[in-house]
From Swiss-Prot:
Cellular component aspect of the GO annotation: cytoplasm; Holliday junction resolvase complex
UniProt family annotation: Belongs to the RuvC family.
Taxonomy of the source species: Bacteria, Pseudomonadati, Chlamydiota, Chlamydiia, Chlamydiales
Keyword annotations: Cytoplasm, DNA damage, DNA recombination, DNA repair, DNA-binding, Endonuclease, Hydrolase, Magnesium, Metal-binding, Nuclease
Principal subcellular localization: cytoplasm
Subunit structure: Homodimer which binds Holliday junction (HJ) DNA. The HJ becomes 2-fold symmetrical on binding to RuvC with unstacked arms; it has a different conformation from HJ DNA in complex with RuvA. In the full resolvosome a probable DNA-RuvA(4)-RuvB(12)-RuvC(2) complex forms which resolves the HJ.
Organism of provenance: Chlamydia caviae (strain ATCC VR-813 / DSM 19441 / 03DC25 / GPIC) (Chlamydophila caviae)
Record-linked Gene3D superfamilies: Ribonuclease H-like superfamily/Ribonuclease H
UniProt protein name: Crossover junction endodeoxyribonuclease RuvC
MF annotations from Gene Ontology: crossover junction DNA endonuclease activity; DNA binding; magnesium ion binding
Entry function: The RuvA-RuvB-RuvC complex processes Holliday junction (HJ) DNA during genetic recombination and DNA repair. Endonuclease that resolves HJ intermediates. Cleaves cruciform DNA by making single-stranded nicks across the HJ at symmetrical positions within the homologous arms, yielding a 5'-phosphate and a 3'-hydroxyl group; requires a central core of homology in the junction. The consensus cleavage sequence is 5'-(A/T)TT(C/G)-3'. Cleavage occurs on the 3'-side of the TT dinucleotide at the point of strand exchange.
Residues engaged in binding Mg(2+) 2: E70
Entry binding sites for Mg(2+) 1: D9, D145
Amino acid sequence: MTQLIMGIDPGTLVSGYAIIHIEQRYKIRAHSYGAIRLSSKDSLTQRYKQLFQTLSGVLDDITPDAVVLETQYVHKNPQSTIKLGMARGVLILAAALRDIPVFEYAPNVAKRAVVGKGNASKQQVQLMVSKILNIPDVLNSNCEDIADAFALAICHAHTSAYTCLGVR
């Protein structure tokens, strides 16, 4: 059975997305990836609309079996937390309208699944994602969000594989 899993690293300026393809015998490869870049000059409402429309287009083109996001975490600035939460809501809605199941993992859980430690740096995540999937492009400094999205997708692939085996 093959499966497509989409990881999304949400943001109000940049949202990275990454789709992995899982083949029989648990072979993982990169399917596609990208970043939705939004202008800080646009209103938040306009950015949320663009985020929704762009991700909806990707979901319509690819139709993944699952969408994976980071769990909400609290920033020092409450307004940042609220704005990010709204971006997450837009992304969840885009998947829900297409009946695509949504899963969430804490950032440290995704990092542990890819790097082996939950407090890994962004650069360590990028390095391991590039090695696991053999895509050196994610080592670029402007690809941190994409690497995080890949980490979330890989984390879900590992977790769902163990769940299917009855391991919790």
